[in-house]
Amino acid sequence: MRTVEVSAAPLAALAAELDEVAARRLTAGEERARRLLAGRTVWNVSAAEGGGVGELLRTMLPYARDGGVDARWLVLDGDAEFFRIAARLHAVMHADPGDGGELGPEEMAHYDRVLGANLEEVRESVASGDVVLLHDPATAGLAPGMRRRGARVIWRCHLGTDAPDGILDRAWAFLEPAVAQADRVVLSRPTYRPGFLEADAVRVIAPSVDPLSPKNRRLDPTAVSRLLADAGLVGGAAVAEQGADGADRPAEPADGAMRAGGPVPPGARTVLQVSRWDRLKDMSGVLIAFAEGFDELPEDVHLLLAGAAVAPHDSAAADVLDGCLEIWQGLEPQVRARAHVACLPTGDREHNALLVNALQRHAAVVVQKSLAEGFGLTVTEALWKGRPVVATAVGGIQDQITDGTNGLLVPDPTDLHGVMTCVARLLAEPAFAERLGQAAHDRVRREFLSDRHLLQYVDLVDELL
C-alpha cells in the first residue's frame, strides 16, 4: 500500500460556515473525538486516490487531523487483474453487469492474494485498538486480517441500488465472507442493506460536501466568468486564473476541452449535466431529451454536457463519450448549434474542481438524469450552490430532493419528456426556480455538510470503543 499525505485543515473555518448551534455541536464533537481516539490511529483504505471516495477523504481527513485525530490514508497496490475484478464489483453493486466477467473461485483467489500482500505491508503499522475504515468493495477483503490484528473494522460501502436483482446478488455472494467480519457496515441508504447483515450491524451515514473545498467554495460572478472563459467552455476573452495565493497563473490549455458544439455563447441560459462518462449517468439520454424537447425551449437556452477528460485506459468512459458525440453529429443543425459537449482537463485537480464549481454556478438549470445512483453528490453540490435542479428519483437523490420544495424529481429515470418538461418549467418560472434554489441551499446546510458527517463517525467510533 502507499500512503497519501494528509495535512490538517482548520475546523474553526468549517465552524464559521455553520449556525451557532451547529458550530457548538461540532466543537463538542471535536473534544469527544480527541478523548476517544487518544493513542489510536484511524486508518482509511481506498482502492484509488481519485474518484468520489478520494474526494470525500481529501476533505474529511484534514478536519479530523486538525481535531487531534491521527487520521491516515492508505491506497491499495494491485495488478491489472485485481482492478478489473474491483471494477466488476463496483458495476455489479449498481446492478450493472459491467464487463460481464466472472466473480467465481478464481477471481476470489486472486482478490484474496492481492489483499493478503497489501495486509502484509501494514502488518507492523496497524495496532490493536486502532480503527480501520475500508472503503468500497476493493478493500472489503482486508476486514478479517485487520480484525486479527485487533483493530476495530468498519466497511464503508458508497455504492448501492434500489433495484436488487440477481446481478447484485453476485457481488454480495463474493463479498459476504469478508463483510460479515467487519464490526460495522456503513451504507448511504437503509435500503442498501443485504439480507445477510443484521440491522444492528449497519449504520446509515449519508455523504457530504465540504463548503470550503475548491468544488464548493464561494465564487463571485467575475471568478466564474474568468474560469469558464479561460477553459473555453463559455465564449469570452480568456484571462489568467487567480490562484489561492491571489497571484495570476495560466489556466490549463483549453485545446480539446470542447468536444462538440464549441463554447456556450455568453449570455445564453445553460442547462447543465456534469457527471462521469458513465452509462448509468445517461448523458446520451439528456442529449436526446434536449433534441426531442427543443421546439418547446426558448431560443437563448443551450445544453452543456460536461465530464472529465477520458483516461487512455478507460474504455467504458470512452464508449459513453463516443456515443454522445455520435448522437450530437446526427442532430438537426439548429439543435447542434445549441448543444455542447465538454471534457474538463484533469491535470490539475484543484483547477478541475473549480471548473465544476463555476459550471454549476453558471447554470440556469442543473440536470442529473441518472439511471441508478448510490447517493449523487453532483446533486448535493448543485443544491448547495442554490441552483434549481431536475433529477431522476433514484438512489440517494430521493433523500436530497423533495419534489416541488427544493428541486424537481422525475419518477421514471427513462422519461425523457418528463425531464424536459421540468426543465422548461424552471426556465419559464424564474421566481419558482429561485425559491427552489434557496430551499436547496438551506437543506444542504442543515443536512449534508461535513460537520454532520464527521459527527456521525464520532458517534460510530464511540459505539465501537
Model-based region annotation:
Residues 1-465:
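Catalytic cores of nucleotide-sugar-dependent glycosyltransferases that transfer UDP/GDP/TDP-activated
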